[in-house]
């Protein structure tokens, strides 16, 4: 089982991103479970989403406190202790950050670090927004940086959740994220 914890701010699409990733996993014959957690302040407040992926049914229904991977959707969150809390040694971190992966220090020995300027990509694809839509560029980055989900498996769930022109723009953002991510092993 792969246990993933998303960290973002309300409005960035962490919950939707985890849902799309879960649907893509399901389309590949895997099992998926998504559990969002957020406070009363939605837009702009901290959002955490727990996502499990497995080849067999998932029975565990708790939060994820020792993740195999963290997905950090807002660059301001990378220094927060709750982001690295419980992250397994040798785990994966995928961050919305302009820094090179080798410059990232979460205080735990990681097996894989990936960075992408998802905020910049969001601005290029969607235009300037008060809260940039970074979930789909991050999904592209996740696809390339890991073997969890194939890039082509993300298109249909994106179209399903975000129909029409918005879906097409998000597919473009996802593909751009796949192309732009930088990955460092060990």
What are the residue ranges of the model-derived segments?
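Active-site cofactor/cluster-binding pocket
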Residues: 1-186
């Amino acid at each position: 089982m792969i246990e993933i914890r998303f960290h973002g701010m309300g409005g960035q699409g962490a919950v939707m991103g985890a849902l799309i990733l879960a649907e893509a996993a399901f389309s590949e014959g895997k099992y998926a479970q998504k559990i969002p957690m957020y406070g009363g302040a939605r837009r702009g407040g901290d959002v955490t989403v727990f996502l499990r992926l497995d080849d067999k049914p998932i029975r565990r229904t708790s939060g994820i406190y020792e993740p195999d991977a963290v997905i950090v959707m807002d660059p301001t969150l990378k220094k927060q202790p709750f982001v690295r809390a419980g992250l397994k040694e040798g785990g994966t971190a995928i961050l919305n950050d302009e820094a090179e992966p080798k410059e990232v220090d979460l205080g735990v020995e990681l097996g894989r670090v990936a960075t992408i300027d998802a905020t910049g990509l969001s601005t290029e694809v969607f235009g300037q927004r008060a809260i940039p839509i970074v979930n789909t560029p991050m999904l592209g980055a996740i696809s390339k940086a890991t073997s969890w989900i194939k890039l082509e498996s993300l298109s249909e769930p994106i179209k399903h959740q975000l129909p029409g022109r918005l879906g097409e723009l998000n597919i473009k953002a996802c593909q751009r994220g796949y192309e732009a991510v930088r990955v460092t092993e060990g």
